UniProtKB/Swiss-Prot annotation:
Its main location: nucleus. Keywords: Developmental protein, DNA-binding, Homeobox, Nucleus. Residues 243-252, 517-530 have a biased composition (Polar residues). One of its GO terms (biological process) is germ cell migration. Residues 421-480 bind DNA. Belongs to the POU transcription factor family. This is Homeobox protein ceh-18. The gene is ceh-18. InterPro entries: HD, Homeobox_CS, Homeodomain-like_sf, Lambda_DNA-bd_dom_sf, POU, POU_dom, POU_domain_TF. It comes from Caenorhabditis elegans. Residues 243-264, 514-542 are annotated as: Disordered. Expressed in the gonadal sheath cells that signal the oocyte, but not in the oocyte. Interacts with akir-1. Gene3D superfamilies: Homeodomain-like (1.10.10.60), lambda repressor-like DNA-binding domains (1.10.260.40).
Length: 542
């Protein structure tokens, strides 16, 4: 057995004496001493003629030993069963020192390297005498007077022990080579990335479930005296983690979004302005002299309009609705926003500027007269039907002269004639859709008079009916279905010769009866016993 194993065996025998407590015996001065030399026999004066047998001498020595009463003294520093913990910690310290000086650990490797000679025996550590190790262990046990052994005390002793001892590894496997055995960590271990601060590392070491120091927090196991604890990280890894400052890593810390520098924003604005000036110059060259507006004046009005709109409390959507009620054309919120940001074409901005300027002037005068924003939004200013009736606050509620008001009214009426009115989307009910489907089945291309009769019978506009027939024919072309009467559309249907002489109501009734007959015909075909049997559709009188 080597020196290190003899040392551990000695400690085990000492601690086994009284259930894990350190026990010493007070013996005679002849048996006590600093060294472990054997007791000397009692000196006696023996003559040459007197012969004392050897058995007698042995008996006298045994009697002396019995006469000395033994007294057990328990170490006050060992009040708990910590034998396994100390032995496992010492074994772990020695093994970690050997592995640290023998093998260069790979960077980022979380597995522990254990060296073995293949015979289950620990490797001998040269340069560490048995007496030196015993003396250091005794000093460690006697230096802790508070009655407890914790991990902090063991770490301090281990640091002092490591500074003074520089072991030199010696192989005992007979080949002169050390065989590294890589063993993966227990699944109870967590990743070393979680121990980025000394506080977290110490907390993890003191946690029994992680298994850094064993089941009882000191690296020992209750299964046996010299049972090996769980595999723990190497001292180099723990020391590097302890010395690592607490700093958030770059990968885990999200970078703060950098604001756009003012130089870039100014460059974008300048390029946007140059693009607007170029397009405006090209469009202004093609415009007449009356409609041409200076670009600087247009930009100044856009800024003024935005400030006044915000001052009065109007949103961009409110301005679009108010312009739609005033001039009969709906303006979306996007249009007003693009006008304020100079994102519209120069020609469209020139057309929209007079409308916004007049609306802004009317709103300013109405608010000065005591009107509220809600009243101005809810006020109806559009025309009813084909009768153009324009209501102006500045004409009826202010003291402007009659000449100015007449000029304003006439200019608005003339401008309304040039504004394109957008037709509202027509929603057809179920009866109107069914009637149009029936008419389309009879004649997909009705002439002008037929289309007018259909529109009057369904109480729809003729343009709505015309667009519906056009869309339906386009839909039928997309699905590649044949359309009856595509080439020639006579004024009188050959199937129903008397159809043209009917009124609109009679035509709808006849079309509905035809549809019901077709449905009954389909039902009779589906329930007939023979597919070749003639079916009675009930429409033979036609």
């Amino acid at each position: 057995m080597n020196t290190l194993e003899n040392t551990f065996q000695f400690l085990a025998e000492v601690f086994e004496a009284n259930g894990g407590c350190l026990v010493t015996e007070r013996v005679s001065p002849s048996l006590s001493g600093a060294s472990k030399r054997k007791s000397r026999p009692v000196k006696r004066i023996i003559t040459e003629d007197e012969v004392i047998p050897e058995e007698e001498v042995v008996e006298e020595e045994e009697e002396e030993k019995v006469e000395q009463p033994s007294e057990e003294v328990t170490c006050p520093a060992m009040q708990v069963d910590a034998t396994d913990a100390i032995l496992a910690s010492l074994r772990q310290i020695a093994n970690n020192d050997l592995s640290e000086h023998c093998i260069r650990e790979d960077e980022g490797n979380t597995s522990a390297e254990v060296f073995s000679n293949g015979n289950g025996e620990d490797m001998e550590q040269a340069g560490l005498a048995g007496t030196d190790l015993l003396r250091r262990v005794a000093d460690m046990l006697q230096g802790n007077h508070n009655g407890s052994l914790n991990s902090h005390f063991l770490q301090q002793q281990f640091a002092a022990f490591k500074e003074t001892v520089d072991p030199t590894p010696v192989s005992t496997n007979g080949n002169g080579l050390l065989t590294p055995i890589t063993t993966q960590l227990s699944p109870l271990f967590t990743s070393t990335d979680a121990f980025n601060s000394p506080e977290k590392l110490l907390q993890a070491i003191m946690t029994p479930s992680l298994g850094f120091l064993g089941a009882n927090g000191l690296g020992a196991s209750n299964s046996g005296l010299l049972s090996s604890p769980l595999i723990a990280p190497s001292p180099t890894l723990l020391q590097s983690l302890m010395n690592t400052p607490t700093q958030p890593t770059a990968s885990l810390t999200p970078k703060k979004a950098e604001n756009r520098p003012p130089v870039v924003s100014q460059t974008l604005k300048a390029s946007k302005r140059r693009l607007f000036d170029d397009t405006s110059r090209i469009e202004a060259a093609s415009m007449s002299g009356d409609d041409r507006i200076d670009m600087n004046e247009l930009e100044a009005f856009a800024q003024t309009f935005k400030k006044q709109r915000i001052k009065f409390g109007f949103t961009q959507g409110d301005v679009g609705v108010a312009l739609g009620k005033r001039y009969g054309t709906d303006f979306s919120q996007t249009t007003i926003s693009r006008f304020e940001a100079l994102n519209l074409s120069f020609k469209n901005m020139c057309k929209l500027r007079p409308l916004l300027k007049e609306w802004l002037a009317d709103v300013e005068m109405a608010i000065e007269g005591g009107a509220t924003v809600t009243d101005l939004i809810d006020k109806k200013t559009i025309h009813n039907g084909n009768h153009h009736t324009i209501h102006h606050v500045d004409i009826h509620e202010t003291s402007i002269s009659n000449s100015i008001s007449s000029v304003t009214a006439s200019s608005l009426l003339s401008r309304e004639q040039h504004v394109k009115r957008r037709r509202k989307r027509t929603n057809l009910d179920m009866n109107q859709r069914n009637a149009l489907d029936t008419f389309f089945a009879l004649n997909p291309r009705p002439d002008h008079d037929k289309m007018t009769d259909i529109a009057n019978s369904l109480e729809l506009d003729r343009d709505v009916v015309r667009v519906w027939f056009c869309n339906r024919r386009q839909k039928m072309r997309r699905v590649d279905e044949p359309i009856e009467g595509e080439m020639v559309t006579p004024s009188v249907s050959p199937v129903f010769p008397h159809f043209s002489s009917m009124s609109a109501l009679e035509q709808i009734q006849e079309a509905a009866r035809l549809a019901s007959c077709q449905a009954s015909n389909d039902d009779s075909d589906g329930t007939s016993g023979s597919p070749d049997a003639p079916s009675n559709d009930g429409c033979s009188d036609l």
